[in-house]
């Protein structure tokens, strides 16, 4: 019997979320790394609409190894809902929770820095 491949997720930071060839497009080891790159792009290339994207590696899915934007806000969640496979996938939902934590930590840090 063939061993079933583990389903995994990979993250990317895109300097230009719409046209990846217009800027840097970096494969990241973790969501935290992708978020740091995304923040850098927001400071240096905000007009290029930076994004964080993900790819699910699942040999049993037609969506395997396709990149898709990770929602950066609740209004972006609508795009994810267009693809039920992604919207309901536990790895994607965990990534969204992690991203929300990272964003909250960044906001707290920003408020602390302003208060100084």
Regions found by a protein language model. Give the residues of each.
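A short, charged, amphipathic alpha-helix used as a generic interaction element across diverse proteins
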Residues: 28-49
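Surface-exposed loop/edge segments in extracytoplasmic proteins
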Residues: 20-24, 63-65
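Non-Sec secretion/translocation targeting segments of pathogen effectors
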Residues: 108-116
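Short aromatic-glycine-(Arg/Gly/Cys) micro-motifs in beta-strand/loop hairpins
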Residues: 2-22
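Short, mixed-charge low-complexity intrinsically disordered segments
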Residues: 43-109
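Short, intrinsically disordered, low-complexity terminal segments
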Residues: 10-11, 31, 43, 92, ...
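Function-determining sites in protein domains
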Residues: 24, 28, 58-60
């Amino acid at each position: 019997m063939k061993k079933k491949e583990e389903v995994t997720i990979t993250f990317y930071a895109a300097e230009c979320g719409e046209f990846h060839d217009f800027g840097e497009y970096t494969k990241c080891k973790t969501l935290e790394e992708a978020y740091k790159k995304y923040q850098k792009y927001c400071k240096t290339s905000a007009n290029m609409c930076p994004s964080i994207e993900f790819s699910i590696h699942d040999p049993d899915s037609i969506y395997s190894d396709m990149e898709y934007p990770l929602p950066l806000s609740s209004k972006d969640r609508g795009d994810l809902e267009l693809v039920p496979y992604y919207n309901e996938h536990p790895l994607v939902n965990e990534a969204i929770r992690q991203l929300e934590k990272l964003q909250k930590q960044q906001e707290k840090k920003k408020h602390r820095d302003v208060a100084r």
